C-alpha cells in the first residue's frame, strides 16, 4: 500500500495525466527484487494497470536479479522478461564486455524470442511517435512541431527552480 500511495504516485501521475512516454527504473530493490527486473512494476502496474505504452529504461549500469538470488550487473534477462526495454549503458554491444546473460537465458528457455521482440516493438513504437518521425512522415507540420516546443504561460522553467551559490 505504501509503495502505491507514496513511491509510485508521482510515476502514476506522470503516466496517466502527463502523458509520459518514457520511464526510468530506479537503481534499487523493492522487497529484494531489483526494480529493473520487476515484472510487477514494469508490466503489471505500469503497462497493464496504468496503460503506459512508451519505453522503460534502466538507470545507468543497473543491476537485476532473479527472485531469491543476489543482484548482478550481468543479469539482464530478468529485465527483458519484465519489459524493461533499454539497458543503460552498454559500452560495446558487439563484444558484450558486461557479459550479460540474455543469450544464455534465451537458449536455456528462461526468456523467449517473443519477449525480445516485444521490447523491440516498444522501442520502435516510441520512435515512430517521436516528433521527428511524425514530421518526416507528414503526420504533423512544422507549425505543429513548433507548437509542441513552445513554452506555455504556466509551464515551469526548471532553471528557475535551481540556484547555485559559489
Segments and roles (model prediction):
Residues 1-166:
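Glycoside hydrolase catalytic-domain context in secreted enzymes
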Amino acid at each position: 500500500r505504501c509503495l502505491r500511495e507514496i513511491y509510485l504516485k508521482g510515476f502514476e501521475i506522470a503516466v496517466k495525466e502527463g502523458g509520459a512516454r518514457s520511464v526510468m527504473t530506479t537503481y534499487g530493490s523493492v522487497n529484494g527484487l531489483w526494480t529493473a527486473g520487476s515484472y510487477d512494476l514494469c508490466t503489471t502496474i505500469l503497462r497493464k494497470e496504468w496503460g503506459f505504452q512508451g519505453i522503460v529504461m534502466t538507470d545507468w549500469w543497473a543491476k537485476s536479479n532473479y527472485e531469491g538470488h543476489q543482484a548482478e550487473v550481468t543479469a539482464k534477462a530478468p529485465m527483458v522478461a519484465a519489459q524493461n526495454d533499454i539497458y543503460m549503458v552498454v559500452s560495446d554491444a558487439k563484444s558484450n564486455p558486461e557479459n550479460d546473460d540474455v543469450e544464455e537465458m534465451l537458449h536455456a528457455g528462461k526468456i523467449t524470442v517473443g519477449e525480445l521482440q516485444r521490447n523491440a516493438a516498444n522501442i520502435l513504437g516510441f520512435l515512430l511517435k517521436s516528433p521527428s518521425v511524425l514530421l518526416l512522415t507528414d503526420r504533423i507540420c512544422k507549425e505543429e512541431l513548433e507548437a509542441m516546443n513552445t513554452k506555455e504561460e504556466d509551464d515551469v522553467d526548471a532553471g528557475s527552480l535551481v540556484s547555485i551559490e559559489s
